[in-house]
Amino acid sequence: MAAPSSNYQLYGLKIGFPPGGLMRNKQMKFNDYGITVKEAIQIITNKQGMQNPDSYTLQITYSDEPSSINTSSGNIGSNNNSSSNTPLTGSLGMGPPPPSASIGGGGGGGDNGITNSGNIGSSSNSDLKKSTSSGIVNVNNSSNAPTRRLKWMDDNEKLISYPLGAHDVVIELKKKYQLIKVYDGKQTMNLIVDITKPLSDLMDLVSCKFKLRSTSDCKLFTYGKEINLNSNIKNLNIDTSLPFILRDNNDPNSLSLESIQWDNGNGFFVGGNGGIGGIGSDDDADDINNNLSVPAKSIINPVREGYLKKQDKKKSWKTRYFKLTDKYLYWYKSPTAIKASGMIICKDYHIKLAPSTHSKEVKLEFTPKHMIAGATTIIHYIKFENEQELKQWTVLPIVIESSNDSGSNNSNTSGGNQSMIGKKVFGVPIEKTVSGNNEIPAVVLQTIDYIEKKAMDIVGIFRLSGSVLTIEQWKAKYDKGEKVDLFQEVDPHAVAGLLKLYLRELPDPLLTYEKYDNFIAAQSIDDFPSRIKLIKHLVKSLPPVNYAVLSYLMAFVGKVATHSAANKMQVHNLSTVFGPNLIKDRQDSGDYGNNVQVLVEDTPIINALALSLIRDYQYIFTDKEIPEQKILAKSLYEYAGNDDGTTSEDDKDLLFPKGATIKVTQQGTDGWWTGEYQGKQGKFPASYVELLPHSPSTLLRTKSNSNLTKKKKFMLEMESTKTKNQEIDKNIKQLEITKKELESTINDLENEKAALENDPTIKAMMNLLANAKTNKDIAMIPKNIDVLFQKFEEYKSSHEALATTKTTLIDEYEQFNNNPKKRLDTKEKEQIQQKYDNLSIIIDKSQKIRSKSINSKKIINDDLVELKKIFSL
């Protein structure tokens, strides 16, 4: 069960990552949930150091909240927040809409989805009339069973527009290139497809893989519906985990639609000899391993489907998703699982009511009709919440036999079994093992009391294993309700093993499956105060019995650690022992590889969480104030700063030498941090320092994750190389595009030139210009202009000389006029005469230059007039 809808803002969203990465999923918070999906992809990839965010897309999966869960006389879990859990019914792979509504297109159109006529993105499909108009996948006939839904998210839509507050929400980061399976009735091919490109692009590859002569008459189907090849997987919202059916109408050997058996509307099977997933006729019924390969979504319109509880080999109850056809009963870990966890052929089993420990609890027992001597007989138990739920499932092929039908007198033994089961301690919910005012189960109290009094100084207590036979004997005594005196036991390791076994066999761990992701996310926080505060909040939110047992147990383990000098069990040793027994993730029986990956990724964090619960007990389980974390940094360089006394106190620089240890009080986002050194406070560049490890849990997590660090480094190097190659390919493609664009531009210019040359108007103008170049008068224009400028300069010089002479004469005349009595001697007369002669020469010369200038101007004017006449033509 997921957290309430508002909790994603507190704990963040569960982000799933593609296979092959460093982790399967991670809890991640966003500062703003109003960002677009594309921006969310950018943030996710940046935080994980992933390259090429444009190559990823997001897919949201979630479960519908059950309308009610009947317990005793009341309804629990009704959904009061319908807005946050609104089903995405307009999408393939989501829940079924009303029969009158179209699927995938958002209501009325058939361009992007499945229409009522039975096509995906098309408007006709006369061949597949056996399918119903609405029952495609995830049809819930039980009102209590949640439906798993999925949808490809639009990059341009806002993140908050999707039901982030729904149950079990997972935002899957998926690559745009997806692996799909295509089946033609004979063979299955794995193909890579870009979910954003039209599926018509895929048909060439299909033709090559299946060696088709032509794809013009080939069609693809999924969910029994024909796919519109002009659209893409993302727009059609197709679940790529399901196979595509390839059919060629012109090929007589092609998969015929008659071979697609809807099995009276109860199930989806292909062919009589096995098809998708290998499900075949009764002849193949014994091939259980082959039959388990049936994807949950490939079973269309089952008789019944929904969540029930099934007992596993360890006698603990697991919630599984069941699908019942007219012959088989399948159970899956989730409605979207690609492989069944198990399968029963109903006609081969005796089905009868099993004894129950609760008055309103009903269980069915499935016993094989044909047993082989010496072989292990597997009896299946399925639990229902009440008789009403059982009646909903009591439909063919499930026929409940009476006690006499199986030849055993259950009436004589049921009471004894009930009494025995009622006293069972191991493998039952922890709240059922306490009585009265005592919140701690007796087995926990007695084992801890024994160890405190007899085994606190035993070397390797809890680390070394006790006798398995002895542990099983004590377990049997507790389960039978016998009086137990552990102090008779001489092997303290057996008693310690008994306590670990009890914790390990709890059907729901002490820290609960529900809060697994929240605890992992809390322990992953680096800041000590924030981490402890969130862990404390989560611990206090546990059920009362869980909290009481956890507090009692962690206080005891802390006492064991104080005897480490004798027992050699330090805190980190004990955290490694108890961590996996306190918290674990649900295991997928059909996905062993994924379980191992999760175990490798989360084990260091689980051990660190147990370490926090033991070492920081006083902060988590008491009211002791959580101290603020001191963040220390070592200076890499000397920082002289600016300490001239003119800056304000807030902007004052912090001066320090190289190698100094600085207390960081604030880490600014602008690259400037605030800190304290030798009693002085101030700012300094963040690039000048290196943070020092400040948390023992951080050191432990770093040490435990050494292998992951190497793997991450290798993966980053591979991703970097891949990115460089992609960038090179991208540049080559861009250069090719640029080359083609330049060639196209050159061709356009040449065509334009040819068109201009052939234009009559342009031709006439070109001829006119050619004739103008041969005209002598026009050819003389530049020369005449040069002559004109030359004459003008000469005229200007003579004019200036004339003005100077004029000024001189005026001055001399005024001098002479002012002194008429002065006599001129011969020499002075000659000088005046000489000046006069020079002046006359200059004036004559100027007159000639002026005349030539006027003539040149006239010539130029005439030439310009002639040129104007030519161009006016």
Swiss-Prot record:
GO biological process, one term: small GTPase-mediated signal transduction
Subcellular location: Cytoplasm
Gene3D superfamilies in the record: Pleckstrin-homology domain (PH domain)/Phosphotyrosine-binding domain (PTB), Rho GTPase activation protein, SH3 Domains
Compositional bias per record (Low complexity), positions renumbered to this chain: 66-91, 113-144
Alphabetized Pfam families for the sequence: PH, RhoGAP, SH3_9
UniProt GO MF annotations: GTPase activator activity
Location of the PH domain: 301-402
Bias (Gly residues): 103-112
InterPro entries for the chain: PH-like_dom_sf, PH_domain, Rho-GAP, Rho_GTPase_activation_prot, RhoGAP_dom, SH3-like_dom_sf, SH3_domain
Region (Disordered), start-end ranges: 64-147
Keyword set, alphabetical order: Coiled coil, Cytoplasm, GTPase activation, SH3 domain
Residue runs in coiled coils: 715-761
All copies of domain SH3, residue ranges: 628-694
Signal peptide start and end residues: none
Residue ranges of domain Rho-GAP in the record: 428-621
Site positions (Arginine finger): R463
GO terms under cellular component: cytoplasm; plasma membrane
SMART domains for this protein: PH (SM00233), RhoGAP (SM00324), SH3 (SM00326)
Function summary: Rho GTPase-activating protein involved in the signal transduction pathway.
The protein's name: Rho GTPase-activating protein gacJJ
Organism from which the protein derives: Dictyostelium discoideum
